[in-house]
Amino acid sequence: MSYMIAVPDMLSSAAGDLASIGSSINASTRAAAAATTRLLPAAADEVSAHIAALFSGHGEGYQAIARQMAAFHDQFTLALTSSAGAYASAEATNVEQQVL
């Protein structure tokens, strides 16, 4: 038989830490958006224009992936927070039943 131990306070703390990390990553991603998606050509020739467009495309691709990862991160953090509340409620109910 396997046992699982969940400490609600630790889950809440982890959710808070994850939210803080996510905020930092999102701020960094927003700060880098203009510099990575709107590159100017190094010269006025066709090759420089294509290279700048290529790298801008990579930057836009990163921004799209970053948005998806931010959404996943938010959902995961919410699930962790909800789990902490559920475990705390279950623990309180268990203690209450033992007292009766």
Predicted regions located by residue number:
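A glycine-centric feature that highlights glycine-enriched low-complexity/repetitive segments
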Residues: 1-100
